[in-house]
Curated annotation (Swiss-Prot):
InterPro entries per the UniProt record, alphabetical: Metallo-B-lactamas, RibonucZ/Hydroxyglut_hydro, UPF0173, UPF0173_UPF0282_UlaG_hydrolase
Keyword Hydrolase: yes
Annotated protein name in UniProt: UPF0173 metal-dependent hydrolase BCAN_B0597
Keywords associated with the record: Hydrolase
Taxonomic lineage from the root: Bacteria, Pseudomonadati, Pseudomonadota, Alphaproteobacteria, Hyphomicrobiales
GO molecular function, a single term: hydrolase activity
Pfam family of the protein (one): Lactamase_B_3
Family named by the database record: Belongs to the UPF0173 family.
Domain of life (superkingdom): Bacteria
Amino acid sequence: MKITWLGHAAFRVETAKAVILIDPFLNGNPGAKGIDFKGATRGVTHIALTHGHGDHVGDTVAIAREHGATVIANADLASWLGSQGVEKLDPGNTGGTLAHEGFTITFVNALHSSAMLTENGVSQALGNPNGLVFHFEDSPTLYHMGDTDIFSDMALINELHQPEIGIVPIGDRFTMGGAVAALACQRYFNFNSVLPCHYASFPIIDRTADKFIAGMADHPATKVLADPAGTVHSFQA
């Protein structure tokens, strides 16, 4: 399995049977400078969304139309995407598991919000925010936390799914900050590797992963992959 951070909370996940984009905010993403957008979306089969904010839904509609990708999202967000012309949708909700070729995806809790502005400038709620747990046939289990704070039921997520790789928001202000994110990883999970995200993009959130790296320093069993956007990491089952 190969995982590429595309800046902010966007990732490309490649396995033998699927190419999945998670929260594909590319155009307008300050953290995606230098990213080859065509390369990032090449061969995409699925798009998975954690929640309905513009910096996570991003380019979903355009990518889904161009590539015929199936979009996986909470039911309310999926309905809205259908109204925007997305044809291949697989809706779910918190606690639900969806099966696709080569992987399953489970919607788990996240502490955040989920809404988009309408043309009239009114905020439209788009279901609950989620984290997403991916179980693959031939690759380690992956947990993208979405946008969230720490919460004690992370212990249940670990008990149920035993994720080996974590994608963790660390930028503060709209999610937990680096020190709290490190606490979440150490207290509730046994990750082999973690990829921090939701930082080094907008100026009002943290610009570096320094606080997270410092918080993880006394937990050497977990490898912190705080590399520049565009870096490709490979993982074996």
